[in-house]
């Protein structure tokens, strides 16, 4: 029998070799998405190192998100759905950093589908659904990101004034609980500016919140009424 060697290259890396380009972002399918990001943002690739990070990140994340939604994964707060939510929100933030206004994910997903539909016809069949999911998640995040970024900026200034380099777990949890900022997003923004997060403090704040929610649930009956009031009412009767 013929022996084969698994190089572990993957299709993209193999395409880099076959197309004689420098990186996966230069192969034909990825370049089309990358160029669309540049078109929407008005930025040029390989002109600014920070812009390039955002361009590559959005290119990678929108491709992943498009395929995940096609596979039936929906944005949520747990499991694979949480991974999807994180990459959509991360791409949305980097879109803002590039100056892209409004929702833009569906426009990029259309390019992903055009480039991949021959090999993955299900993308074309599900494109309207994919566009809808991306746009809804993007709009949901847009409602909170501006407020959250403003609050985080205020926290950064307070840390600078106090000569501190670590955001308290309580403040990190406030951003998560009130403004929908995943911990890793807050962490990414802060690390760009030389700050860190008290992750243990964040976990503690989350446990306190879970306990409060659990205790509140125990204190109510199935219709949400205060159990103590019900018992008092029964006794009075």
Name every feature range the model reports, one short phrase each.
Residues 231-237:
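Conserved small/polar residues in nucleotide/adenosyl-binding loops
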Residues 24-27, 77-78, 99, 139, ...:
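Ordered, soluble secondary-structure elements with a strong preference for glycine-centered loop motifs
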Residues 1-131, 188:
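Feature marking long nucleic-acid-engaging regions of large polymerase/nuclease enzymes
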Residues 5-9, 177, 234:
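Short conserved micro-motifs on helix faces and helix-strand junctions that flank
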Residues 141-225:
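Extended, domain-scale alpha-helical bundle/helix-rich regions
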Residues 125-150:
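Metal-dependent DNA phosphodiester-chemistry modules and their immediately adjacent helices/loops
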